[in-house]
């Protein structure tokens, strides 16, 4: 997520027009901001690293937990319900990558998904007014 019309902005737009939003509670991932990926790319370039690297924020959450935190940080009171439908919409139930190569090369890992989202929302809410 980052600038543009992605999951955060789409969810907030839905919160403006829908009284209740259903979000999968059985699909797990590690939401990662574009800013955190950019920081890792910079560190890889500094180290002149090569190879295949995964770069994801720390921690795991469901899409429901991610959406709940977005709405809370945005001050939205929209009701949000868990929908259990892993696999029905083409999304795997567990989609968490491992930062193994970053750890092996001693490259600083991205922050937790909560910290990254908090920072993103703080800046985005200022920008959005």
Per-segment meaning from a language model:
Residues 7-11, 34, 38, 63, ...:
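A general structural signal for well-ordered alpha-helical segments in protein cores
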């Amino acid at each position: 997520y980052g600038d543009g019309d992605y999951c955060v902005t789409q969810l907030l737009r839905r919160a403006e027009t829908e009284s209740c939003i259903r979000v999968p509670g059985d699909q797990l991932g590690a939401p990662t901001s574009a800013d955190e990926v950019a920081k890792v790319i910079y560190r890889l370039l500094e180290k002149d690293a090569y190879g295949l690297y995964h770069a994801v924020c720390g921690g795991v959450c469901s899409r429901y937990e991610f959406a709940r935190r977005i709405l809370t940080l945005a001050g939205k009171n929209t009701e949000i319900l868990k929908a259990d439908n892993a696999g029905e919409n083409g999304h795997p139930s567990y989609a968490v990558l491992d930062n193994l190569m970053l750890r092996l090369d001693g490259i600083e890992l991205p922050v937790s998904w909560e910290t990254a989202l908090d920072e993103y929302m703080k800046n985005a809410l200022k920008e959005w007014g």
